[in-house]
From Swiss-Prot:
It comes from Bacillus subtilis (strain 168). It comes from the Bacteria. The keyword Endoplasmic reticulum does not apply. Its EC number is 2.7.1.-. GO terms for molecular function: kinase activity. This is Uncharacterized sugar kinase YdjE.
Length: 320
């Protein structure tokens, strides 16, 4: 890896989307298999833009695990830190959507839950310019949670730039929201760049007002905060300056992976920033970074899928 690379650490899994109309999983018969996992999506977004991205995580040494590795390899993500477990299966998620918006969700957790510090190539991690922690599953339980927080602490001690996206999933944290808030705050405390949705901001900060919520995240320890607001754009703050950066109008077909695309686009630019540790003081630069990330996130919504919908730099130029 080169010194301007980004390593994304977390889960890589299979999403099975039920393509039958208005049925629950018990009645569903047809499913579309797709590569998933927020950190993996971020690594793919960076690579498709032409950046250097690596993924670190664990899958099963099974057909699904090989499919996932091949998917990341195809978009030129470095998978040399992807561990394939011979005993645990690849994590699988099954989702169906009814016309009333009700979601049926089953999560079969596998190899990603067993990710430990022993699975990490610390020497390679130390070479990275940015470490991104954006797992929806890492904070759920040990050993993954302890490994995640420990890696963030090591990166902080090394002076590396730390990115964090809590990726709250109600289906996974039902009945354990206070536990989610507690571990998310531990991660935010050591993070340089924190991306949250407006829902996540309210859950973590405990307040509905966006500006007050952002101030709380800064008090916890975040240097740069980006709150995605959907069509309204992104609220950007560095603790001193604060502004809503507008998005671009698009006809949305599928918003899957839009948040991950936003993060990937932001990290792609941050990785190419010379003075990254002081970038939080340059609000003009931050504004440019978020404006570009907004565009990438919006463009992803115009296509089906997560990784397949991610644009290249050339495609962004044509679209805009």
């Amino acid at each position: 890896m080169r010194s301007h690379s980004v390593v994304c650490i977390g889960e890589l899994l299979i999403d099975f989307f039920c393509t039958d109309v208005d049925v629950d999983l018990m009645e569903g018969r047809q499913f579309l298999k797709s590569a998933g996992g927020a950190p993996a999506n971020v690594s793919a977004a960076i690579a498709k833009l032409g950046g250097d991205a690596a993924f670190s995580g664990k899958v099963g040494k099974d057909p699904f695990g090989y499919f996932l590795k091949r998917t990341l390899d195809a978009v030129h993500v470095d998978t040399s830190m992807l561990v394939m477990d011979e005993k645990a299966p690849t994590t699988l998620a099954f989702v169906s959507l009814k016309q009333n918006g009700e979601r049926d969700f089953v999560f079969n957790r596998g190899a990603d839950a067993l990710f430990t510090l022993e699975d990490i190539d610390q020497e390679k991690l130390n070479e990275a310019k940015i470490l991104h922690f954006g797992s929806a599953t890492a904070l759920l339980s040990d050993p993954f949670c302890s490994a995640y927080l420990r890696l963030m602490s090591i990166a902080k001690d090394n002076g590396q730039f730390i990115s964090f996206d809590p990726n709250y999933r109600e289906d996974l944290w039902r009945g354990r929201v206070s536990e989610f808030v507690s571990v998310a705050k531990k991660a935010i405390a050591v993070s340089d760049f924190v991306k949250v949705s407006d829902e996540e901001l309210e859950i973590i900060s405990g307040v509905k007002d966006h500006e007050k919520g952002v101030a709380i995240l800064h008090e916890i320890g975040a240097n740069i905060v980006a709150v995605t607001l959907g069509k309204s754009g992104t609220l950007l703050s560095n603790g001193k300056d604060r502004e809503i950066i507008p998005s671009i109008p698009v006809t949305s077909i599928d918003s899957t992976g839009a948040g991950d695309a936003f993060v990937g686009a932001a990290l792609y630019q941050l990785a190419n920033t010379d003075q990254i540790q002081s970038v939080d003081a340059d609000f003009v630069k931050l504004r440019e970074i978020v404006a570009f990330a907004n565009k990438v996130g919006a463009l992803v919504c115009t296509k089906i899928g997560a990784i397949d919908a991610l644009p290249s730099l050339d495609e962004i130029g044509v679209s805009l």
